[in-house]
């Protein structure tokens, strides 16, 4: 699988942004909007945005595959957040007029405890061996997804550690107009980040599965490249999102040659998300499990078993996949 950038921290917007004092369409109870101006940001220019690879920004929750207990494991995103006292100090600092000075964090005392198995995200700055919080006062990180952890039950539904495989959605290797759901060795995904999408994630913007029969999948970051993107101008991108089938996506992530990731979200352009008919649901999808060795070894209720029952079947769109349980 071709590897692009890894999502280990929040991505900056391709445009310089400004805050407008009107209710957010992205977050309930947020009294302001963050909107893109027409100026491309210095971060984007420094990362050579014009030579970057544009890909679909997928709406789910971020995951990571790395080693745990001497085998490839799926990890869930868990950001360490400040305790109440530290959060209050930080908010006062942000709202003060004399905020030219840098805020001082005491990582050992200011943050809520993390699970023992927690690891900080890669690429974040460290001082004296301690990770430095981001501009929101969070320390991005990961925790391994254990099989019986109810908190991460939807994460664990897409992996099988006995056979070291994961359920992955990507383009069919021989037909870019066809999507494919397959069981991929976790070892092929090592050190990659992916997006978990499905019934119980982020309000299910792609309409996958049902409450009775939930369906979740992993999508490698950068899996869906955008072929005919217009010029990097505010109005051209706005027209593209509004006017063509390929633009019916949450946003764009540019994978830059230096590993930097730059994004634009529909909300940055004043557009709504989620939307009724997404581009992801406009393409046919085929099931290709290729699991002859372990056909009879799965729990009858698990996702892998459900997909084996419809192996090699083709559906007009992802929404049409219904398990006959």
From Swiss-Prot:
Q: What is its EC number?
A: 6.5.1.3
State the needed cofactors, names only. Mg(2+); Mn(2+)
Keyword annotations of the record? ATP-binding, Ligase, Nucleotide-binding, RNA repair
Among the GO molecular function terms of this UniProt record, one is: RNA ligase (ATP) activity
What is known about its processing and modification?
AMPylates itself (auto-AMPylation).
Q: Does the keyword Cytoplasm apply?
A: no
Q: What Pfam families has UniProt attached to this entry? A: RLIG1
Q: Name one GO biological process term.
A: RNA repair
Spell out the InterPro entries in the cross-references.
RLIG1 (IPR041211)
Taxonomy, superkingdom: Eukaryota
Function field: Functions as an RNA ligase, in vitro. The ligation reaction entails three nucleotidyl transfer steps. In the first step, the RNA ligase reacts with ATP in the absence of nucleic acid to form a covalent ligase-AMP intermediate and release pyrophosphate. In step 2, the ligase-AMP binds to the nucleic acid and transfers the adenylate to the 5'-PO4 terminus to form an adenylylated intermediate. In step 3, the RNA ligase directs the attack of the 3'-OH on the 5'-phosphoanhydride linkage, resulting in a repaired 3'-5' phosphodiester and release of AMP.
Name of the molecule in the record: RNA ligase 1
Its taxonomic placement starts with:
Eukaryota, Metazoa, Chordata, Craniata, Vertebrata
């Amino acid at each position: 699988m071709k590897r692009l950038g890894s999502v280990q921290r929040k991505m900056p917007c391709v445009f310089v942004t400004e805050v407008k004092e009107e209710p957010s369409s992205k977050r309930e109870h947020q009294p302001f909007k963050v909107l893109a101006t027409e100026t491309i940001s210095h971060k984007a220019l420094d990362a050579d945005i014009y030579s970057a690879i544009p890909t679909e920004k997928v709406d789910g929750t971020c995951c990571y595959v790395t080693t745990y207990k001497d085998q490839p494991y799926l990890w869930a995103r868990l950001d360490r957040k400040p305790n109440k006292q530290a959060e209050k100090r930080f908010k006062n600092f942000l709202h003060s007029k004399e905020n030219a000075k840098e805020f001082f964090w005491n990582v050992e005392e200011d943050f809520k405890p993390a699970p023992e198995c927690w690891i900080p995200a890669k690429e974040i700055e460290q001082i004296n061996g301690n990770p430095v919080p981001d501009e929101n006062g969070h320390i991005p990180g990961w925790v391994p997804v254990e099989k019986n952890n109810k908190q991460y039950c939807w994460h664990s539904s897409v992996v099988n550690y006995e056979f070291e495989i994961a359920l992955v959605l990507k383009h069919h290797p021989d037909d870019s107009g066809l999507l494919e759901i397959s069981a991929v060795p976790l070892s092929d995904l090592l050190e990659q980040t992916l997006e978990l999408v499905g019934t119980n994630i982020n309000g299910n913007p792609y309409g996958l599965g049902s409450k009775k029969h939930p369906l979740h999948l992993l999508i490698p970051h950068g899996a869906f490249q955008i072929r005919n993107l217009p010029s990097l101008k505010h109005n051209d991108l706005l027209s593209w999102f509004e006017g063509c089938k390929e633009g019916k996506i949450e946003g764009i992530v540019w994978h830059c040659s230096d590993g930097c990731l730059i994004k634009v979200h529909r909300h940055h352009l004043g557009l709504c998300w989620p939307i009724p008919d997404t581009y992801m649901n406009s393409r046919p999808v085929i099931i290709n499990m290729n699991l002859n060795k372990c056909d009879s070894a799965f729990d009858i209720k698990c996702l892998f078993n459900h997909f084996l029952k419809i192996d090699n079947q083709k559906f007009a769109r992802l929404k049409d996949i219904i398990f006959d349980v």
